[in-house]
Amino acid sequence: MAPAPSFRGHQWTYNPVRGSCLLLLLVVSNLLLCQGISCPSCGPDMFVSLQKSLIDVFINAASLSHDFHNLSTIMFNEFDEKYAQGKLYYINATKSCHTNSFHTPEERDKAQQMNNEDLSKWTLVLLYSWNNPLYYLLLELRNMKNLSEAVISSAMEIENMSEKLQAFIESQFRKIIVPVLKMIHEVSDTWSRFSSMTFSDEDRSISEYYNLFYCLRRDSRKVDMYIKILTCRTRKTC
């Protein structure tokens, strides 16, 4: 198992006031430049309005991450109830998660000790790492016998939510995108393992799907937790 990547060379000390000011000024500057307007002195009313807009963006992302985890949990429970009753799939489920090599923090208290850059990196690492599995999962689920349309619909919605959450993190923390992609490519298992998920043995196939749903539920909880921490810091309510 590969060691967890270190971000010590990229530390960013969290300062909510300074960080918010810089981001808001950048937003205003970009908007005015695009319109060909010289930047006026920004009054307090404009600052408050832009700060509220930024907070609203994070609140919406937190709501989306909550739905992302909730739907992942519902999908896992539906699959577990229909296919895994009386089976022992859960014994090895945790060990088989393809994101295990990243050693992302499981508990909130540990996640809260991380700065914003590291939290956003781990969020994007998890979301990117699920792009490939979700793509192939949707292809294979449509071929499963007696699988409810609700599960397929949930998987499609989860993929859509993941893309929206990725866009949110990318827009707020642009400089982390390249390091995150590099980190993921160094762990080839996150990209190559799911290129073929078709198995001749039905029990093995169900076991693999069970593991996927289990790991997705676990990782979506982490994503939800990280984004909510980022949101409460932006709102200064932590």
Curated annotation (Swiss-Prot):
<keyword id="KW-0964">Secreted</keyword>
<dbReference type="Pfam" id="PF00103">
    <property type="entry name" value="Hormone_1"/>
</dbReference>
<dbReference type="GO" id="GO:0031667">
    <property type="term" value="P:response to nutrient levels"/>
</dbReference>
<dbReference type="InterPro" id="IPR001400">
    <property type="entry name" value="Somatotropin/Prolactin"/>
</dbReference>
<keyword id="KW-0325">Glycoprotein</keyword>
<dbReference type="GO" id="GO:0007565">
    <property type="term" value="P:female pregnancy"/>
</dbReference>
<feature type="binding site">
    <location>
        <position position="66"/>
    </location>
    <ligand>
        <name>Zn(2+)</name>
    </ligand>
</feature>
<dbReference type="GO" id="GO:0046427">
    <property type="term" value="P:positive regulation of receptor signaling pathway via JAK-STAT"/>
</dbReference>
<dbReference type="GO" id="GO:0009891">
    <property type="term" value="P:positive regulation of biosynthetic process"/>
</dbReference>
<dbReference type="InterPro" id="IPR009079">
    <property type="entry name" value="4_helix_cytokine-like_core"/>
</dbReference>
<feature type="disulfide bond">
    <location>
        <begin position="232"/>
        <end position="238"/>
    </location>
</feature>
<keyword id="KW-1015">Disulfide bond</keyword>
<dbReference type="GO" id="GO:0005148">
    <property type="term" value="F:prolactin receptor binding"/>
</dbReference>
<feature type="glycosylation site" description="N-linked (GlcNAc...) asparagine">
    <location>
        <position position="70"/>
    </location>
</feature>
<feature type="disulfide bond">
    <location>
        <begin position="97"/>
        <end position="215"/>
    </location>
</feature>
<feature type="glycosylation site" description="N-linked (GlcNAc...) asparagine">
    <location>
        <position position="146"/>
    </location>
</feature>
<dbReference type="GO" id="GO:0005615">
    <property type="term" value="C:extracellular space"/>
</dbReference>
<dbReference type="GO" id="GO:0030879">
    <property type="term" value="P:mammary gland development"/>
</dbReference>
<feature type="signal peptide">
    <location>
        <begin position="1"/>
        <end position="36"/>
    </location>
</feature>
<feature type="binding site">
    <location>
        <position position="224"/>
    </location>
    <ligand>
        <name>Zn(2+)</name>
    </ligand>
</feature>
<dbReference type="GO" id="GO:0007166">
    <property type="term" value="P:cell surface receptor signaling pathway"/>
</dbReference>
<dbReference type="GO" id="GO:1903489">
    <property type="term" value="P:positive regulation of lactation"/>
</dbReference>
<keyword id="KW-0732">Signal</keyword>
<keyword id="KW-0479">Metal-binding</keyword>
<feature type="glycosylation site" description="N-linked (GlcNAc...) asparagine">
    <location>
        <position position="160"/>
    </location>
</feature>
<dbReference type="GO" id="GO:0005179">
    <property type="term" value="F:hormone activity"/>
</dbReference>
<dbReference type="GO" id="GO:0046872">
    <property type="term" value="F:metal ion binding"/>
</dbReference>
<feature type="glycosylation site" description="N-linked (GlcNAc...) asparagine">
    <location>
        <position position="92"/>
    </location>
</feature>
<keyword id="KW-0862">Zinc</keyword>
<dbReference type="InterPro" id="IPR018116">
    <property type="entry name" value="Somatotropin_CS"/>
</dbReference>
<keyword id="KW-0372">Hormone</keyword>
<protein>
    <recommendedName>
        <fullName>Chorionic somatomammotropin hormone 2</fullName>
    </recommendedName>
</protein>
<comment type="similarity">
    <text>Belongs to the somatotropin/prolactin family.</text>
</comment>
